[in-house]
Amino acid sequence: MAIKKSMSLVSLGLTKTRGWLCLFVLCASAWSAAQSASKQQDKSQDQIGYKSAADAEQKKTLLLKDFQPVPMLHTPVHNVDRAKYYVIDVHNHVNDALGIDEHMPPERVIEIMNNTNVKTVVILTGMWGDKLQRVIDEMVKPYPGRFMVFAQIDWSKIDDPNFSQEMVAQLDDAVARGARGLKQLKDLGLTDRDKSGKLVAIDDPRIDPIWEECGRLGIPVSIHSTDPEAFFHPVDNTNERYEELIEHPDWSFYGPQFPSKESILAARDRMFAKHPHTTFVALHMANWPENLDYVSHLLDTLPNVMVEFGAREAELGRQPRRARDFFLKYQDRIMFGTDNGMDEAMYRNHFRWLETADEYFDYWGYPGQGRWKIYGMELPDTVLEKIYHKNAERIFGQFRGVANIK
């Protein structure tokens, strides 16, 4: 009996031991499974990018020129084949005397204009004398009302004792030949020097008679002064136009050998104020579209100044709300200009920017001026009509003997 009882107790002890052992095995299995799942999760997290790849730095060798990302945005696209109202392009160089753009058969130029509703193009760089005459004979005379040409000043004669009188006579001759305005390149105030080595400032008194003569003749002066703000900063990894400047190093005006952008514009603005009876077109949105507060002050202060946006679609298009407010406020002072050669797609890109509310699309020439996109302004019809042609007609209507472009 005692032996049986003892055996029962042993059996009971073994049973309990087996139970604890099973429980231990089950717990161990659960812990092992949890650890395995955790490791699997960590591995999964590594795979979907929660941790940097070990060779990430090694892979950062893609050249900037080869980086061409395709936006994944799904936004409406409204292509505008023809401008809503006919256009006067006040800033072009097609078939000019300087050869700024590649020469194009005049018939093809007219075809592009007809296809896009561009009525008249102003060829700014006509030079003077025989070179001016060639532009007039090729582009102006055969196509009445479709082209106008502006003359230029011969700055190589700046040191002549009678420079002012000679240039006034040259200007009078240009207008007699058919020139309808005067174009001034950015060299004045930036790189042009007299024989003493002194920089010729835009408000140099020797030039005053020329500006005054333009007022007397009733012709506007289209003037390009300075360049984008980034051109006056170091060409380094912080410059938003780095790619453009390494491709065109002569466009960089950073360094002690150049005057500051601000000083050049200040001289130009003093000149504007000194000649209130002459109409000036401050090209490229007064050459500070990055600073529309400055342009606003200029227009508020000087009623004899107009602006246009040639080659500055990129700058204005990336600040759509600010730019739209500006265009609405100064709708009587802004004219349509391109400064981008002659191309249907170029004009249509500008129309899309002005007429639609499309978002995040390429400016014309992207990424030449910088790696950003632009946004449409969807301007009201009354504003579009002024910018497309009415403002230009008001200014160019001052010309004597000009064909009725309406």
Residues covered by each model-derived region:
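Active-site gating loops and adjacent loop-to-helix segments of metal-dependent hydrolytic enzymes
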Residues: 46-66, 84, 193, 229-257, ...
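Acidic-and-aromatic substrate-binding clefts and catalytic sites of carbohydrate-active enzymes
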Residues: 96-104, 124-133, 156-165, 192, ...
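Bacterial N-terminal signal peptides
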Residues: 19-30
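Hydrophobic faces of well-ordered beta-strands that scaffold small-molecule active sites
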Residues: 88-92, 121-123, 149-151, 182-183, ...
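H/E-rich (His + Asp/Glu) clusters that bind or coordinate divalent metals
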Residues: 256-257, 261-270, 274-406
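An N-terminally biased module of ancient metal coordination in phosphate/nucleic-acid-related enzymes
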Residues: 37-142
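Active-site gating/metal-coordination segments in enzymes
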Residues: 51-71, 78, 132-251
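Bacterial N-terminal signal peptides that target proteins for export
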Residues: 2-21
